[in-house]
């Protein structure tokens, strides 16, 4: 089960289980919520292939994609029903939540029993479901374009689909594909480039709409690239499992800054402090005594970048399993698991210390109740095992050399 949390002015959005809550960051009151319907009613368009409509796929092989990757699909059981093997179907739950730039639309992807992209009209009225479109596989990242007319969804096999937000029932369009899971995706403000990062250390810049044409690569990371953030029209920031935070000119594919981190980075958020000049990058670390690092990025007149200030936030790391976080102008909100139960904690962004200033008494219980985390029979919350993100390295050379050494010694003894 996943927990997602984000800040989209003027509200904090939390998703967990089957619910999404909208919280006012000023008084921390819940003013709107979404609960997934029991049956998403997923239907295929006639123009959709089985690959993009798992809800009705019955064959095991749906052909090959460009690049020769074979697709293996299995029929999706009804929620609460039984699969072909006789096991009970997994409950559908919220996986990713993204707000459109104009603040009018909300994209929610689900995982488990029914994998889908749900599009909601979120303002000005209460959230209203516009469409539910099936996903072939669980989504790994979601991003709207700058004019909110479409949304990109990447999945865990590396494929990226474009979904129309005007014709909300239109079938998706396959734009591009990676050979490994895509962890984050950006769409440039001018909508000329789509920027993706994956488990294979790569940052790829693809031209749009001619997505068959790769514009550039930003190469240099030695482990998975977990997060991307758009800084200016030509610059992005990236964080990686190789313990580095980097800034790139993505148009040229040129690295402009490499800053060493104390631990592998698994999440990246960036806030703009001064337009196109000063930014605050927040990095979530993997298994480190400090949970978060806050870095002040500054751009000079000659287009060089530097980290001018660093703040490490402990966030009681080690006492609970941290899964996600978001930032507002004065607070850090962190979600995680404590004794296999969802927990949410608030920290002051200036000091990095836990804060109760402006936090109403009983607020945490109210939010957890709203997400259904305290309900009797609620499933345990176990955050994703991020150790699988790292490359598995096998050393068979040492064993070979040891065997060769023993064989040479045995031959010498026989000659004697």
From Swiss-Prot:
Pathway involvement of the protein, from the record: tRNA modification; N(7)-methylguanine-tRNA biosynthesis
Cell compartment(s), UniProt: Nucleus; Cytoplasm
Tissue: In testis, it is present at high level in hub cells, a niche for germline stem cells of testis. Ubiquitously expressed in all testicular cells throughout spermatogenesis. Ubiquitously expressed in all germline and somatic cells of the ovary.
Keyword Cell cycle: no
InterPro entries xref list: Trm82, WD40/YVTN_repeat-like_dom_sf, WD40_repeat_dom_sf, WD40_rpt
Gene Ontology biological process terms in this record: oogenesis; spermatogenesis; tRNA (guanine-N7)-methylation
Signal peptide (residue range): none
PANTHER family: TRNA (GUANINE-N(7)-)-METHYLTRANSFERASE NON-CATALYTIC SUBUNIT WDR4, WD40 REPEAT PROTEIN 4
Similarity field: Belongs to the WD repeat TRM82 family.
Quaternary structure (record): Forms a heterodimer with the catalytic subunit Mettl1. Interacts with mei-P26 and weakly interacts with bgcn; required for the function or formation of the mei-P26-bgcn-bam-sxl complex. Interacts with nanos; may be involved in mei-P26-dependent derepression of the BMP signaling pathway. Interacts with Myc; the interaction may be mediated by mei-P26 and may be involved in the regulation of ribosome biogenesis.
UniProt name for this protein: tRNA (guanine-N(7)-)-methyltransferase non-catalytic subunit wuho
Annotated source species: Drosophila erecta (Fruit fly)
